Amino acid sequence: AWYINRAQIREAYTRSTIQRKQAQAALRSGRGEQWSLQLKEHPVFYDYEGGVICLAKSSDTKTLFFDIPAAREDSRWYLYMNGDLYRKKWEWLKLHGSGVLTEFFANGDRLMGKGHIFYLDISEAWDAIHLVLGAPQDGDLIDMPFEEAKKTIERLL
């Protein structure tokens, strides 16, 4: 038999409702940024029970951080599952205030070769990432070169 904890369902619904309302308010007020990233090399994925953490090279000195939840509401999860995050161009809208990422698209040709996907225990992943990257939020740019971020995390794990 399959049982549902009603309290957990209510809490999840409340959280998603609050986030949705914050995102709608930010959209109505016009507070958001359109982002675009042209990938030249494969992003790195750290897969965990609740989703996937993604690092991508943004520039020579910056790394893009995504924390993609395994949720139906986040289009990035389906793109990841279908292998479409290996496309050359990413575009998204990040709303101010709520920090919610919406309207994410991955376009263009696929990057050549294979990317790197690691499966990590969530506590292990978060401890290492927060230590190395300074507690980034979803969609943040980190002041660290991509290769340095990857190698440092891998060394810590």
Question: Model-found features: residue ranges?
Answer:
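N-terminal topogenic membrane-targeting module
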Residues: 1-54
